[in-house]
Amino acid sequence: NNFSDCFWKYCV
């Protein structure tokens, strides 16, 4: 899980 992946895709 990459931080950038979750950040820009808003996977909250």
Swiss-Prot record:
One of its GO terms (biological process) is blood vessel diameter maintenance. Its main location: secreted. Keywords: Disulfide bond, Hormone, Secreted. GO terms for molecular function: hormone activity. It comes from the Eukaryota. Coiled coil: none annotated. One of its GO terms (cellular component) is extracellular region. Disulfide bonds join 6-11. InterPro entries: Urotensin_II (IPR001483). It is found in: Secreted. PROSITE patterns: UROTENSIN_II. Pfam families: Urotensin_II. Belongs to the urotensin-2 family. Has a suggested role in osmoregulation and as a corticotropin-releasing factor. Probably involved in smooth muscle stimulation. This is Urotensin-2. It comes from Scyliorhinus canicula.
